[in-house]
Amino acid sequence: MSVPLILTILAGAATFIGAFLGVLGQKPSNRLLAFSLGFAAGIMLLISLMEMLPAALAAEGMSPVLGYGMFIFGLLGYFGLDRMLPHAHPQDLMQKSVQPLPKSIKRTAILLTLGISLHNFPEGIATFVTASSNLELGFGIALAVALHNIPEGLAVAGPVYAATGSKRTAILWAGISGLAEILGGVLAWLILGSMISPVVMAAIMAAVAGIMVALSVDELMPLAKEIDPNNNPSYGVLCGMSVMGFSLVLLQTVGIG
């Protein structure tokens, strides 16, 4: 099994961490969740804008028009799909109301699972493609995706457990969204692995960079602010950028990058 595929599987499996937290009742503080989402956004933004997009534009045979065009395509494609697909957001379920209605909250959790699954599928492809092109960047993207999958698993498992009383059912529903990400990585491994050219890989990387930027500014940062309105998510973003930037410099210094 390839290392990029293993990274994709591990990133998707992080959903189960949130699921177990949801059924065990040991919910992390809103401040910690918000910081982790901002941290993940910082990692994605730095890797996308400072590494992936420049690398795609510098690839042999890649024209600036195609490179920037694919980046914009990734941006607009994410926003378009996000607006077209009706789904609840994780913060809607993480905020516990007094005596929630079991049937209503279960239906909302199922809709959330569907929405997260559809949105996680391309994330799996993005993680695999990035790691295949540059393993160093793949580790960073896998870490960022894993951090943002934990509250997603928590957001689904907690309400389903409250509605059904079944830990197994709650973990199952939460795990489906993580499995969708793994499926995306497996399909990318099967379809793209042997027949992709350097130019096509660079074009996909540019589009993935656009998707990651859109995900960071449209989903992760606003979600962090909604989960913890009293703190600025920018601190998490800056920490994520700093840690990722330092790690990239360190890896390049020792000759890994």
UniProtKB/Swiss-Prot annotation:
It catalyses: Zn(2+)(in) = Zn(2+)(out). Signal peptide: none annotated. Its main location: membrane. Zn(2+) binds at E123, H148, E152. It comes from the Bacteria. Fe(2+) binds at N120, E123, N149, E152, E181. Keywords: Cell inner membrane, Cell membrane, Ion transport, Iron, Membrane, Metal-binding, Transmembrane, Transmembrane helix, Transport, Zinc, Zinc transport. The keyword Transmembrane helix applies. GO terms for molecular function: metal ion binding; zinc ion transmembrane transporter activity. Pfam families: Zip. The keyword Transferase does not apply. It is found in: Cell inner membrane. The chain crosses the membrane at residues 5-25, 32-52, 61-81, 137-157, 171-191, 195-215, 236-256. InterPro entries: ZIP (IPR003689), Zn_transptr_ZupT (IPR023498). GO terms for cellular component: plasma membrane. It is a multi-pass membrane protein. Belongs to the ZIP transporter (TC 2.A.5) family. ZupT subfamily. Mediates zinc uptake. May also transport other divalent cations. HAMAP family: ZupT (MF_00548). PANTHER family: ZINC TRANSPORTER ZUPT, ZINC/IRON TRANSPORTER. This is Zinc transporter ZupT. It comes from Escherichia coli O81 (strain ED1a).
